[in-house]
Amino acid sequence: MSNPITITESAQSHFAKLLAQQPEGTNIRVFVVNPGTQNAECGVSYCPPEAVEATDTEYPFSGFSAYVDGLSLPFLEEAVIDFVTDKMGSQLTLKAPNAKMRKVSDDASLMERVEYALQTQVNPQLAGHGGHVRLISISDDGVALVQFGGGCNGCSMVDVTLKEGIEKELLAQFAGELTAVRDSTEHDRGEHSYY
């Protein structure tokens, strides 16, 4: 797999100096908190050997490795870490243009763009309740059919979530393309249900 993160020579040199003062085997971790949301924040931290997870991806650089967790990885596509020096001093910069919302091309199908919005904007909010939603189809007259899962299935709040949250958000984002959002889920209340 190609490396989604560019670390400039000056930043690599800066990290190597910092890591030389850490216990042997310490590398760096690059991550995104709240990936795919407007609250996404990127960060870099030390990563001692015992903090490496089996699901991490390792990217070797000059004198150290950068570890990235699976959830952050797609949102760090095209990220650039640089160490810049100017009249004000020097600082590390991390630019991750896809952290808040990975772009789908503007000419992608309506189905792809709506699915993308559900995955990056709606599902992170539903995840707090153990729920998720997926797009089933879009009719010729612009009605998106969605299916809830996890904690949303059987939840008494699902109608409010659909009408006041998801439908409102999608109709605003896809004005002129979507006319309504409908729920195709057969809601069976159970222990998995949030409410």
UniProtKB/Swiss-Prot annotation:
Binds 1 [4Fe-4S] cluster per subunit. The cluster is presumably bound at the interface of two monomers. Its cofactor is [4Fe-4S] cluster. It holds the Pfam family Fe-S_biosyn. The keyword Phosphoprotein does not apply. SUPFAM superfamilies: Fe-S cluster assembly (FSCA) domain-like (SSF117916), HesB-like domain (SSF89360). [4Fe-4S] cluster binds at residues 152, 155. Keywords: 4Fe-4S, Iron, Iron-sulfur, Metal-binding. The keyword Lipid metabolism does not apply. GO terms for molecular function: 4 iron, 4 sulfur cluster binding; iron ion binding. It comes from the Bacteria. One of its GO terms (biological process) is protein maturation. Homodimer. Belongs to the NfuA family. Involved in iron-sulfur cluster biogenesis. Binds a 4Fe-4S cluster, can transfer this cluster to apoproteins, and thereby intervenes in the maturation of Fe/S proteins. Could also act as a scaffold/chaperone for damaged Fe/S proteins. HAMAP family: Fe_S_biogen_NfuA (MF_01637). NCBIfam families: PRK11190.1 (NF008392), YhgI_GntY (TIGR03341). This is Fe/S biogenesis protein NfuA. It comes from Vibrio cholerae serotype O1 (strain ATCC 39541 / Classical Ogawa 395 / O395).
